């Protein structure tokens, strides 16, 4: 994959439910704590090195931000870092929360 793909929240939810992809949430800590997708990893400048060490780059990665804009830059960055299959979630957490309000966790993990 030379370029990331943009996917809808329904496709992201299906991939996550089937264990087909890792979900990375790039929103700020306060927003993440207020609500995030269960199982999402909070990706920050501080957690990025650990992700790079622990992830083989082969498992697909989905990037989520607030509305689907910032995730595009992060997805492109991850591709340049050697991740093979990267997706940006269209509409971000805002779209996820509207589509799947029952699938929102609170607090940090």
From Swiss-Prot:
EC number: 2.8.1.1
Active site: 65
Gene Ontology CC annotations of this record: cytoplasm
Signal peptide: none
PROSITE patterns according to UniProt: RHODANESE_1 (PS00380), RHODANESE_3 (PS50206)
Keywords: Cytoplasm, Transferase
InterPro entries referenced in this protein's UniProt entry, alphabetically: GlpE_sulfurtransferase (IPR050229), Rhodanese-like_dom (IPR001763), Rhodanese-like_dom_sf (IPR036873), Thiosulf_sulfurTrfase (IPR023695), Thiosulphate_STrfase_CS (IPR001307)
Residue ranges annotated for the Rhodanese domain, each copy included: 17-105
Function of the molecule: Transferase that catalyzes the transfer of sulfur from thiosulfate to thiophilic acceptors such as cyanide or dithiols. May function in a CysM-independent thiosulfate assimilation pathway by catalyzing the conversion of thiosulfate to sulfite, which can then be used for L-cysteine biosynthesis.
Family statement drawn from the similarity comment of this UniProt entry: Belongs to the GlpE family.
Protein name: Thiosulfate sulfurtransferase GlpE
Species this protein is from: Edwardsiella ictaluri (strain 93-146)
Gene (name only): glpE
